[in-house]
Amino acid sequence: MMNTALQKKCACRVVRLAVACAGVIVLTLTACASGPKPLDWQLEAKGAMERSVAAYLEGNARVEAVEFARAKTEVSSTGRVDLMARAELLRCASHVASLVFEPCAGFEKIRQDAPLAERAYADYLGAALQPKDAALLPPQQRLALTGGDAGVKGMSDPLSQLVAVGVAFQSGRASPAMVQLAIDAASSQGWRRPLLAWLGVQASLFDKNGLVEEAARVRRRIVLTQGDLKAPR
């Protein structure tokens, strides 16, 4: 049974622009029954950003691009650099989760005006975070940065896990256990793109260690995951 205070808290409706995945909450808007409803741009941006991230992780780059452009249009109407920075970072986080390492070009265009926390997160995604800036990271990513395998395993959000292992992989710190955690996280959500990427890493690790049968098993799983697709679109 919930106590009265918790019931009152739950009576409020929380609307997020995008998901709280990857440790980045793009925007949180709380609307209680007695308060104003979320504005149209907030709802449109939220929906488009969520669809964009989902499409990318499922392997559909075309839909991702369309939905991300829609989200940016809505966010740009506010003139707020912090919101645009977070939208760009969420997109880049989904790429890092899928082992696509490239400059976060959209964010870099507005870096000089972005808040310090967003700059730190961008550096983190590029495996270039300065130790002094670690405190600026979202709590789950700080945990992963310092906690190793246990830190990643303790993360509650699948995309946060994938991003953390992706950053560790860039830095040469990803253990076989972390790779398995990334595989499990992607598989649990049906995210084809990162699953294929991390299965490829695991197969290479088995090859490197002379584990022929294990490598062959993983490659059969890759074929199964691809289905009728030769590669993510």
Tell me the role of every PLM-derived stretch.
Residues 69-73, 111-112, 183-187, 204, ...:
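Amphipathic alpha-helical segments of tetratricopeptide repeats
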Residues 117-191:
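Extended amphipathic alpha-helical interaction segments
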Residues 37-114:
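N-terminal Sec/ER secretory leader and immediately downstream segment
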Residues 28-31:
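C-terminal motif of bacterial Sec signal peptides marking the signal peptidase cleavage site
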Residues 44, 84, 175, 195-196, ...:
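Residues that mark the junctions of alpha-helical repeat units in TPR/alpha-solenoid scaffolds
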Residues 200-233:
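A cross-kingdom marker for long, charged
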